[in-house]
Amino acid sequence: MTDRKEHKMKPGRRPTEGMTPSQERIMQVIRNAIDRDGLPPTVKEIAEALGMKTPSAHEQVQKLVKKGFIRRTPRKARSIEIVEQSPEEEPVEKKPDVARLVPVPIIGEVAAGIPILAVENHIGELLMDSRTARGPCFALKVKGDSMIDAEIFEGDYVVVRHQALAENGDIVVAILDGEATVKRLYISEETIELRPENRSYQPIVVPPGGDIRILGKVLAVRGHGAANNNE
């Protein structure tokens, strides 16, 4: 697991030094939204404002985080913050608290798209903060793009707490007719819906008595490349 660095401004560095033109435009959209609405934009709103695809906007936002221009709180809506740049300070190394890291097994793949056959196969592990990975947890690698508006992209890993029950609006991993999928859960008196976070996909409606089982609730999302693989 690589250490993360928080980059702060070096002496004489201009506010946009180190940004690409695309990243400068994204920063301007963020500033405008905060000035206008008092809230930062979502990645989807950034993409719409600049005529970009959501995955492309997400990639550039992540690069701005790595460069230290913004920070984000994982799995929190509208969590983008602009980092105030200090011209006196050098880059500061941030190391994880190793004592708090726990291994979470990666046991296979889950569909963010058409459900795929649920086959458990231990393919590696993620190191997670024990404050996040509470209880019996596992991870699955995401296939498909049905959850991109929730910032879950193909190749990412979802960290899931094993539980049979979940609340309306939770993002869950469900087994439907023997196949696994990650979707947002909505329950009514008549039906259960597994809703995608991508307008290109339709909700999966499960009638009363349908063959569905909640495998767990998604606690966190880790980008591809975060795993220690057995392969």
Swiss-Prot record:
Its EC number is 3.4.21.88. GO terms for biological process: DNA repair; DNA replication; negative regulation of DNA-templated transcription; proteolysis; SOS response. The active site is at S146, K183. SUPFAM superfamilies: LexA/Signal peptidase, Winged helix' DNA-binding domain. Transmembrane segments: none annotated. GO terms for molecular function: sequence-specific DNA binding; serine-type endopeptidase activity. This is LexA repressor. It comes from Magnetococcus marinus (strain ATCC BAA-1437 / JCM 17883 / MC-1).
